[in-house]
Amino acid sequence: MKMGRRTQTVHHGYRRRRAEEQPDYEVVIVFDPKGDADLLKRMYVECERAGRLDEFYVFHLGHPDLSARYNAVGRFGRISEVATRVAGQLSGEGNSAAFREFAWRFVNIIARALHALGIRPDYQQILRHVVNIDALFVEYAQKYISEHDPRAWDTIIQIEGKLNDKNIPFNMKGRPLRVVAIDQYLTQKRIADPVMEGLKSAVRYDKTYFDKIVASLLPLLEKLTTGRISELLSPNYADLNDPRPIFDWMQVIRKRAVVYVGLDALSDTEVAAAVGNSMFSDLVSVAGHIYKHGVDDGLPGSLASGKVRINLHADEFNELIGDEFIPMVNKAGGAGVQVTAYTQTMSDIEAKIGSRAKAGQIIGNFNNLFMLRVRETATAELLTNQLPKVQIYTSTPASGANDAINN
């Protein structure tokens, strides 16, 4: 379904007021699950023809040495968006819903603490502290206590010196003594700090029980941090020797850039889907910010700006689709996002998302539907069932023949 010229939008530019002005190009973002080299080459050629190579970004999981870098949780309007983007990819069906809610809360605790420490969240940081929350608890406690009561460390050291296996609470067994001492000090002083309270509640879980309830979160994070992928999704902003650019969606939109996203799904479908969904979730968040505040919000001397047309092309989008894609097609239009999706059959969408109702919701939110060589009956009926019925009053048979020699 929905076929078209994906590279044509590279040349689109808004009308110029004066001939000497540069055209105000449209944003073009192409998601390609397979990472097709021909499509990438075509986009490169069209960007060169349009004079847009300086604003052309290539993100490709199959070529980490050449790929740009991207942090899906590094930019946010509200800190809670970090937890939503991570936990939103977990299953919410049946008994899994409770584990997803806990995962959201725990990731939110980590993200708030990192933000308070001045550390930009990324998947590597989140995984590190999911596995070992104690280090983050101690680090934030050092910052908080040094700012509010530097002499408290003498008391904490005294408490730590008196601890042994007999007087450590059962739920704190297996925790470092420094963690137990800080927890007891904070309980005595009744310190009211939301971030500190969240971390304290996390370390108070029995360690064995805690490991069980975060077990559903670890596979997702390991998919996003294993091997060279970690370099792309958790970029080191302080490494000045790395020539690979780092981009985010707001930067792309403000620069009217062109982005090619190759997810290398033939090599690893699970990682491709996880990365694609995280990008969609981030883009939905940016669209919400643009809808409320405009594109240039926060820039010096900026005024309320109009919408920028954002052309989003998702090839074989059934490979990428998830709950994050639904608000993209039914709400992001208010921020200027125009989604063009390409797939073969409706069954592909339904099989991926696991719900016929959600599949119908996604398809129903597209304004236009184009079909070419459709083989599945259910897919063809998406078009034929919308055609009006007419009455045929007369039917006239006709036949003819031509002499090929005379013509």
Segments and roles (model prediction):
Residues 1-337:
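P-loop NTPase motor domains
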Residues 15, 98-105, 109-112, 248-251, ...:
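P-loop NTPase motor core of the ASCE superfamily
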Residues 32-34, 342-346, 374-376:
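A short beta-strand-to-loop transition that corresponds to the Sensor-1 phosphate-sensing loop
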Residues 36-38, 64-66, 346-350, 378-379:
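Short gly/pro/ser/thr-enriched loop/turn and capping motifs at secondary-structure boundaries
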Residues 332-353:
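Sensor-1/coupling segment of RecA-like P-loop NTPase cores
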